[in-house]
Structures are given as structure tokens and as C-alpha cells.
Amino acid sequence: EYLSSFYGCTYEESKQITFKILYGGIPDDIAKSIPFFRKTKEYTNELWSKYNRDNFIETDIYKRKLIKKNYTDMNRSKLLNYLLQAYETECNIKTIIELQRYLYEKKTKLVLYGYDSFTIDYNNSDGVDTLKEIKKILERNGHLTKAKMGKNLGELQSIQDRL
């Protein structure tokens, strides 16, 4: 919503514009007029300098090294993209581990993970508190969630108000 006010468009449209700018490179005029992009461009330049100086960069959570010689066509935008994707993936790995530990002795199971979604096969015998705890796990670190339920993926209905 913050960026949609700068663009003068809807939230959904602003998401598309933002990703296009982030992953395609931040033009100087955008960086000058929108503080978020100014800071992002500064951060990207810092990452790029470190990557070129050290010949690698580490991911934030698991400290995996992206070694320069393994990426022949790397550029600033790609480096930022790779690190953002790595951060999201590594956060989700931690979330999956926490969910699996919580669900270990329950009949409810995590059955599918997609980039920004988790599909849970909920068993009524585990009780609604199980769903509430799953929601808490997913919302750690300030992540927002939407909860839906249905007999299959094509029939999902929101259950936000019940949690």
C-alpha cells in the first residue's frame, strides 16, 4: 500500500510494478523520488561491491556462499534477486522444520509448500487449537497469513474470522 500511493495505482498493480523495478534494476529517477528504492539501490550497490571484492557473498540465514566464479552473467539486480530468493527460502526452511516438529505426533500434516504458501491437511481430531498454533508459527517474524479450508484446493473458503 505504501508504494501504491507513490505510483497512483491499486495495491495489486503496485506489487507488479515493484517487482519489475526490483528485479530489473532501479532507475535513478525512481531511487531519487521513492525512499524505499533509494535505500534498496544503496544496499544493492553495497552487496555488489562486497561480491566483487570478496569473490563471493553469503546468504543471510544459513551463510551459504554464492561464489563469483560459478555465476558467469551476474549483475547487481540478479545478485539482489538471488539473495532475496535465498532469504525467503531459508526462512521457509526454518518454518517447515518448526511446523514439522509441532505436527510430529498429530494427525494434521503439512502436505505442500509453495514459495509463499503452505498447504495443511487438517484432521478434526487435533482440534482448532492446532490451526491457531500453526497460524502462530507461520506469522512469526511479522509474516501475514490467510487461512482457507475446503475438501480440495478448488473449493477453499476463508476461515480467517474463525482463527
Give residue ranges: language-model regions:
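Extended Gly/Ser/Thr-rich low-complexity repeat segments
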Residues: K132, K136-R140
